[in-house]
């Protein structure tokens, strides 16, 4: 049974490995909201996961340590297990979905674990890890549905109360539910009036469904670039704890997550992975009643693949009206591009790419499509540009795929 004493013991044990991460004010991020960020993206291994993994492994007996440990993970728990096991001289094996970010896979290997890539999702990696555990007798370190792992994650709740004693609300990402279970238990045990909100990706809402339907269930699929929370089945223990200690769970879209990552980079100079940005997405897009509340967004991790980050930045720019493409039907004659460019320039936007398409079979011989890539200020400026182009006699067309 999880107790507050166990979380305090985890806090003592973790002093030797985990950082007490900063809690920073984020006044520029969400104007009108008293927002703070708990920066677990700056934690050892770049994620909160080292807390639960290290505490769990530290409590193994000598006999259990001799057997080695095995885990399943989309990446962050893997790194926590690898670091903890290596520091304690224990063999570690981690099963990871083959779609896990390359940087997380390579980091896990560098930290000393043997990695087996499994085709499919986190749940498939979990099934393979259980199979190997039964074959080898190694000790399975569950990423979330384990009392000691939850106790380790709960130390974040103690830190939040220490750093912001008058906190009113805490927003936490949810995958399997280990993080929010520990944080909610710790905070509600000491300050039961504090609101605990959970956030999931709209493409992987397993705990959100379970919470609102009051029953434990497995999704058919979990599709989101926020790989750290792409979980089809919530934990049994965590479901019970979430049902008891969490006040509300909401979901955010892929575009909203991308916009939150971009906002964190631009306004706070922080890099968050998809899962870590979900609390900020919930705050930015008004998913929760935060007015008048001192609110902490728990940035759970920052381990995002740079290739994915590049695409996320582009998506975030489009979502915020900072980047757009326009397709214009033109007469194919001198001066047309110059006229379009003058209008765009007069509106204060910047042309970053130009492409003429004369290959459409349905197009008149004397016509072409002009595709412009623009850097813009916001959605209102984009609409102004479209209006000015239309007033000048240019025909805007839907971009073809």
Protein language model regions, located:
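PLP-dependent amino-acid enzyme catalytic core
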Residues: 1-401
